[in-house]
Amino acid sequence: MSRSETLFANAQKHIPGGVNSPVRAFRGVGGTPLFFKHAEGAYVIDEDDKRYVDYVGSWGPMILGHAHPDVLEAVRRQLEHGLSYGAPTALETEMAELVCSLVPSMDMVRMVSSGTEATMSAIRLARGYTGRDSIIKFEGCYHGHSDSLLVKAGSGALTLGVPSSPGVPAAFAKHTLTLPYNDLGAVEKTLAEVGREIACIIVEPVAGNMNCVPPAPGFLEGLRAQCDQHGVVLIFDEVMTGFRVALGGAQAHYGVTPDLSTFGKIVGGGMPVGCFGGKRAIMECIAPLGPVYQAGTLSGNPLAMAAGLTTLKLIGRPGFHRELAEYTGRLLQGLQERADAAGIPFVTTQAGGMFGLYFSGADEIVTFADVMASDAERFKRFFHLMLDGGVYLAPSAFEAGFTSIVHGETELSITLEAAERAFATLAKA
């Protein structure tokens, strides 16, 4: 048995499914999940000392690569002053100032400890601000595991083949309307009928939890116009896209300004952090200024603020996001060329430093239906062939991939050589 197999067997005795987040269990690809013991730069190393080029990046945060020395040093410095105070710090104010300066829509921001907490709080705030109960989300989009959002959710719920989670009361779900992603007509029709009941529309500006589906031309702009027309709060869930698609997030990249935004992953530099913010008039409704309650023992944790601040400052250098997108584009071009040469139906998508891989004969991937029509079984085989070649992809056909700024020529060569062998093997199957 490998060390990972031994550890997984033991983990299952004490941890449900042997993991602390479902997608890590490899149910989407089969086999035993890898247990990692070290990560550095563009690589992760498992418990059997096998080294892999990493395109998961801890599900997005590691845009600088793993164990960046400046981030580690910032955390070490803060460690000497304590782990947590449960009180305001200069670091959290500095973080708030930086986030508001980088993101076009942010007048004020509140720090929390996860992306789920950020989206949950933003929706509560939108409901409190508007006095309305119902919300709109989109099929295949995932906004964390709070009850009102696990309604036809993507990500892990999609991989497990369930449209919503047991344990979510019908009374919660009835206030969540789920519409097709990239279908502006469905939004227009729904708001024409029940717009007065809708507190907010929450959307991933790039749907990163049904792999990676960019917005159709005019979709985000149309959402903005519809929200303005019906007095609905527009929330961009930028937990995944924030500071990755562009320094100012997807909203800066696509030129559409939401009322509220949620962030996670990169904003914590690898530590457990989320935040939400937006227009001052809305944010001033939250406690202690207003009646909408939100709180958190570890919100603004100084260790996390140190890691996040350092990360955001480093990715702000000129040319950073252009270089990240260029590498990602070269990676996808190389994969597409090798799939085509092997006669394998294959489509890629890209939004800056995030990407999607689909075994599909479609010309493009635009909708949830397009995603579901892709060949998940072929992806499973591809995943393990790439793993054998020293490349770690997301262990699910429905999760986006991520590059970092330290992925370079060596990593590109390793990846494309492994892919060429993998596509050739698939072509013979």
Swiss-Prot record:
Subunit structure: Homodimer.
UniProt key word Cytoplasm: yes
Family matches, as Pfam families: Aminotran_3
EC number: 5.4.3.8
Protein's name according to its UniProt entry: Glutamate-1-semialdehyde 2,1-aminomutase
Necessary cofactors: pyridoxal 5'-phosphate
Modified residues (N6-(pyridoxal phosphate)lysine): 265
Entries under SUPFAM superfamilies matching the protein: PLP-dependent transferases (SSF53383)
Cellular compartments annotated: Cytoplasm
Domain of life: Bacteria
Catalytic reactions on record: (S)-4-amino-5-oxopentanoate = 5-aminolevulinate
Example GO molecular function: transaminase activity
Pathway participation: Porphyrin-containing compound metabolism; protoporphyrin-IX biosynthesis; 5-aminolevulinate from L-glutamyl-tRNA(Glu): step 2/2
GO annotation, cellular component aspect: cytoplasm
Main location: cytoplasm
Gene for this chain: hemL
Record family assignment: Belongs to the class-III pyridoxal-phosphate-dependent aminotransferase family. HemL subfamily.
CDD domains in UniProt: OAT_like (cd00610)
HAMAP family: HemL_aminotrans_3 (MF_00375)
Single GO biological process annotation from the record: protoporphyrinogen IX biosynthetic process
Organism from which the protein derives: Azotobacter vinelandii (strain DJ / ATCC BAA-1303)
Keyword set, alphabetical order: Cytoplasm, Isomerase, Porphyrin biosynthesis, Pyridoxal phosphate
InterPro entries with a match to the protein in the record: 4pyrrol_synth_GluAld_NH2Trfase, Aminotrans_3, Aminotrans_3_PPA_site, PyrdxlP-dep_Trfase, PyrdxlP-dep_Trfase_major, PyrdxlP-dep_Trfase_small
